[in-house]
Amino acid sequence: MPGGRFVLPLLILALAAFVYGLYGFDGVLLRDYSIYLYSGQRMAEGVPPYVSVFDHKGPLSPMIAGFGVMLSGLFGSDDVYTVRLVFYATACLAVVAIYLLGKAVFRSQEAGLLAALTFLGFYAYAQAATSGPEPKTPMVLLEALCLLFATQKRWFWSGLFGSLAFLLWQPMGAFAFVTFLLAATRPREERYGATLRAAAGIAAPILVTVAYFYYKGALEDFLNGFILFNFLHLQRGGTQITSVLVTAASNIALPYATMLVPILIGILTILRLYFKRPFEYRFLPVLVSFPAPILWSLRDFQLADDFYVFLPYAAIGFGAFLAAAMRRTDNPRALTAILGAILLTIALANTWDEVSSGAAYKLTGTTVDLPTQREAALEIEERFGEDLKLASINSPQILVLLHRENPDPYLWITAGVDQEIDARVQGGFEGWLRDLEKFDPGAISFFGAGQSLLPSSHLTKEHYQALDTWLNPRYRAEQIGPFWLFVKKDLLLEEARRNTTVESSESPGSRESLEDVEGQ
């Protein structure tokens, strides 16, 4: 019937929306998420990424966040929830893309359906779908669409989505390259047109992005953050293969615990395709692209979201494995329905705290939620006044929640950003500290729930000493709810005086506490 081919994709979309929606939108706002939200807030005000906040990843995630902030302004909704809703929509669409990819590669609707249901069970992806903005959530959608259109030989669209994935995370440029390579190696009669369409699709998003930053007078900032910093200053943890493999294992085992067996079977199914004879083109985009994330992961694997790039392969591989097994039975439809129900049950069980509490803590490092963070941010204003000047050197969540502007683009200084500051700010790192002193922040946020790195992590010895020397006489560390801040000692003293005045009016004997504070 007309439109019948859309029924199952729409049902999968609705199912994904239901399952992911069960996680709720109140998950903790992690440091990295707040960087993209802050950039999105500033972009909605007309300030482009890299100018508003320095970052070394692609511009697409803050642009998507900026779109969400603009929508919140249009509808009068909360900007954090609206941005999360936009990223949630990309996650739901990713499930549909996985279905279409599995169906196209293995020419089986059952394989596509089981692949989508398998994908719903990947906890590390599902949890972040509503608690972001996790920048790699839309990456999976773009990756799956790039592979889907390459499988269908729709070169422009494959190149377009591969290019968008590259603008989200630089290593994804491998997918755009695979599209171009496949197009350029088509038979002679197809080659010219295919190559031209692939090149046009790849070029279009890049040219639009470059034009945007050029128009904003920020092309140098874009090129520096997107490309140069990663070669000149970026600092990571262990880079030895053994260390990387240990990190990868620890960040896969628990966050994906309920689906480890399907992941393993799915990956092995994909690997088996390399030896399948006779070989068919429909497998080629998947097989040519698959080594790229493997090679990158051997070089740099940090957290569970670094495994996202493998999820489409694992999902369609496991879906194909189950579909092939079902075809060998007497009643494949009934067994497919049973297996689908089992996979859906796992996906639903993942939403229960009793099942996923360990995985959740591994992903976020805290049990704090967004409402708790909001309360703490408001408490900061209540304690020190709404006119309090705020800055961040490692924890911009407070700036996002209170809609405050940082005095400079450096919301975090780990991972080699201190060397970037030293190279680009007039007067170097010490000049940056002098500029910060001129701004005279009453409080500087530096740590929050779920973080693992202090602002001193990865700093050079000289920069660590300079920061410590500058902070010690002026500020004292103070915990307010889930946040740690360096608060000016003068502000704390003034607060103590106010509290003592109130206490003395109720109990004259309480004046001694002020002397204790002044002596600190």
Cite the ranges covered by each PLM segment.
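Transmembrane-helix signature of polytopic, membrane-embedded enzymes
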Residues: 4, 98-123, 140-141, 156-157, ...
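Hydrophobic/aromatic-rich transmembrane helices and adjacent perimembrane loops
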Residues: 293, 299-334, 338
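Loop-to-helix entry region of an early transmembrane alpha helix in multi-pass inner-membrane enzymes
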Residues: 59, 63, 74-96
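Membrane-interface transmembrane helices that cradle and orient dolichyl/undecaprenyl
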Residues: 138, 143-158, 184, 259, ...
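Multi-pass, polyprenyl lipid-linked donor-dependent membrane glycosyltransferases
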Residues: 60, 86-90, 114-121, 125-145, ...
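Short periplasmic/luminal acceptor-recognition loop of GT-C membrane glycosyltransferases, typified by
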Residues: 56, 158, 177, 354-357, ...
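Membrane-interface helix-loop-helix junctions at transmembrane boundaries of multi-pass membrane enzymes
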Residues: 2-4, 104-105, 187-198, 265-288, ...
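Membrane-interface alpha helices of multi-pass inner-membrane proteins
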Residues: 143-149, 155-170, 175-183, 203-204, ...
